[in-house]
């Protein structure tokens, strides 16, 4: 289900499939969703049509986290439907309806973001417990591994985002918090504790990009789980990008 906040009301749109992520497109009121069986366009009425799916996508896999780069390309990872399926996880790029493989050999590809000022792409493969940095070619969308940017010691890393200073904000599944790490040193700078163990993702929003929005997964016995939280951290985020239908 895709939930959209409009004028203080929540609009819920059923997809009939697992939905890993959704991003707005450059067409007003339209969204691009990464579902179990591929990439689909949506609007407030539901699914409009399928764009496509990777020809080499393994069986029993679905799309998970996804995000657009500044060129309007969608990057989306795939994970096993029923847990760990080995290192068959991949990161795909959708550009102008064409799908290409960016990374492979991962177990559970998850959060990602770009630092265009430094020419870096950050990617999480959850079981590794790290955030990895890659040199990023914005013209070709190619990546090459650079270094480990941060090591997560409480829980495992899930979703992530960057702030305006280039720091890494990481949702720590099983750790009950979002932590901020300096990109150059990996040192922890700040943390936001949540009343939920399984913190799944985070992003900056609001008029001034100074609100951190945090998602949590429902967990039996935890009254504070399964909610979307908002908090001020003293940091500002970066502009996010929509999918470009060129």
Located regions from the model:
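A short beta-strand motif characteristic of beta-propeller blades
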Residues: 8-14, 49-56, 98-104, 145-151, ...
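Beta-rich, blade/repeat-based domains predominating
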Residues: 16-32, 57-74, 82, 102-120, ...
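Short loop/turn segments that connect beta-strands within beta-propeller blades
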Residues: 5-8, 43-47, 94-98, 135-139, ...
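Blade-level signature of beta-propeller repeat domains, shared across WD40, Kelch, NHL, RCC1
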Residues: 203-246
